[in-house]
Amino acid sequence: MKKQTQAIHLEYERRDAYDSLSVPVYNTLAYEFDNAAIMSEAFTDKIKAPDYSRVENPTVTNLERRVAALTDAAHATAFNSGMAAISNTLMSLAAQGKNIVTSKHLFGNTYTLLVATLRRFGVKVRLRDLTNIEAVREAIDDDTCCVFLEILTNPQLEVADLKAISEVAHEKNVPLVVDSTVIPFTQFSAKSLGVDIEVVSSSKYVSGGATSLGGLVIDYGTPYNGDFAKRLYGEMLFNFGAYMTPQVAYMQTIGLETLDARYRVQSSNALELAKKLRTLPQIQYVNYIGLEDNPYHELAQRQFGKTAGAMICIDLESKEACFNFLNNLKLIHRATNLFDNRSLAIHPASTIFGAFSENMRRSMDVKDTTIRLSIGLEDVDDLFEDIKQAVESL
């Protein structure tokens, strides 16, 4: 079956009393057992049965199994946010005295998790240019617990060579962990590129309508992962209590079924819009990996296929121009989410990176002159006209 068909049909078996066509929402905390022996076996994992919805729920399990089947993974685990997925993953791999090799180009909260929170627990962080394979090789040593990166950085839109990095990491028995939020896991094969663990903010493309918050950890079960699965599920999930709710899992299952169709339209819209934006003299630079002269275009196509996602960044003359541009928008929404059905715009330097110092933002290549656009399902002509009138009013 093709991915779109799999997303709709995989892993759901109608076993409820009414043969519901859609996955039911099991809005329950606890589950009754026929006798004490079976109850004991469930709690000690001798039999597979849900015992408490803080760690397992049939609605959530269906989403997890569907994601694992779609990605050819060993396991998928659903969390209540993308940051919960990232933090639980890294804490499952890291320990005092260990180090994580990563990039300076990270989502703001991921950056602070690494350089502030985990450092307080004795985990070292090595920030490197991950487009430089030799720099990655030199950074990895016997205490490296993982290499972590975003497959398309936000808002720099930088692409690293996953296959090359995975080969370097695997030479030293180190797993490669990637955040694939900005390119859906249904659109490319992370496993074939050597990725060992994939984390996703399912609040974005999977949710689609910006109505549910969640995260996914996709474990490919490779030899480089060690006891990761045991730690993630048997320790982190149990002890930190960040499991996805059944209501969210139900909504995100519906989102998953339409993800491929939405993504194809959003990517097509983004490419057409990016080309049109180049005709506006007020825009100094259009950054989109779908454009043929983008420095990462060839690598992105090799890794992610012909579609390039729904995120475009544009550079204007100044920070003041960026603020005025946002204020001039009439159709596109000023909001911080990504990959909603609606198109969104934000000034990253003053919002998601606003708590960082100017020097820190500069070191992360977050510019005051950049606007990030998340392209939705609207007609491209309407989006272009809105941006056109916004920049012409500067």
Language-model features and meaning:
Residues 271-330, 334-342, 356-362:
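Conserved small-domain helix->loop->beta segment predominantly found in fold-type I
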Residues 48, 74, 213, 248, ...:
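Short amphipathic alpha-helical segments
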Residues 30, 35-84, 109-116:
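Conserved N-terminal alpha-helix of the aminotransferase class I/II PLP-enzyme fold
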Residues 251-261, 309-317, 372-376:
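Short, well-ordered beta-strand elements within core beta-sheets of diverse protein domains
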Residues 7-13, 75-280, 287:
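Conserved PLP-enzyme active-site core in the AAT-like
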Residues 12-14, 27-33, 204, 258, ...:
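Glycine-rich beta-alpha junction loops
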Residues 115, 124, 262, 320, ...:
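PLP-dependent enzyme catalytic core of the Aspartate aminotransferase-like
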Residues 1-57, 371:
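N-terminal "arm"/small-domain region of PLP-dependent enzymes with the aminotransferase-like
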